[in-house]
């Protein structure tokens, strides 16, 4: 339906607090289904099977949860650097495809700033060329603020979109106003 109606989309993988949930397997399955459009923006940090933090692919940085609402910076664990490199490279390929200038810079081995990456993600989400993947545990309020931040940062405002309806009694077409 998102392709038919030209709607942007994002995938949020839940239950990261459950021991046997594998975020990497979900991302691999999504990639098999949708190809290179899948772009993981975060992935979990686990210790002793527990969901204790996440890696931000855009910023290439780790965050550890310190309580229900707080988090602090932490190094990316060694066992996750391979996945960070893989997901970051996939994201950089998507960023490069945003413009000729970015494509040239990518092939010259140049790096992109966080602001450039974020702007390119927003452009690619809006045209449907990538589908961001986030994760968390809504039950424990982990990852939900990242999801909301990503929606606000990468998706177009609904106020910039017109929507028409048909009045049931008169069959007249009208423009819906969200204000």
List PLM regions with ranges:
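Structural and coupling elements of P-loop NTPases
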Residues: 2-179
């Amino acid at each position: 339906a998102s392709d038919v109606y030209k709607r942007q989309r994002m995938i949020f993988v839940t239950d990261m607090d459950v021991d046997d949930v594998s975020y990497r397997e979900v991302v691999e399955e999504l990639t098999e289904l949708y190809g290179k459009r899948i772009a993981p923006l975060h992935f979990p940090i686990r210790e002793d099977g527990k969901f204790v933090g996440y890696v931000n692919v855009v910023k290439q940085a780790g965050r550890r949860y310190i309580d229900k609402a707080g988090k602090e910076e932490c190094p990316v664990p060694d066992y996750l650097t391979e996945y960070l490199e893989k997901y970051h490279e996939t994201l950089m390929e998507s960023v490069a495809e945003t413009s000729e200038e970015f494509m040239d810079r990518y092939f010259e081995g140049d790096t992109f700033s966080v602001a450039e990456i974020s702007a390119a993600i927003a452009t690619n989400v809006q045209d449907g060329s990538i589908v961001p993947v986030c994760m968390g545990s809504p039950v424990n309020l982990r990852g939900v603020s990242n999801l909301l931040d990503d929606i606000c940062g990468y998706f177009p405002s609904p106020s910039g979109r017109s929507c028409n309806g048909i009045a049931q009694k008169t069959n007249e077409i009208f423009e819906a106003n969200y204000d």
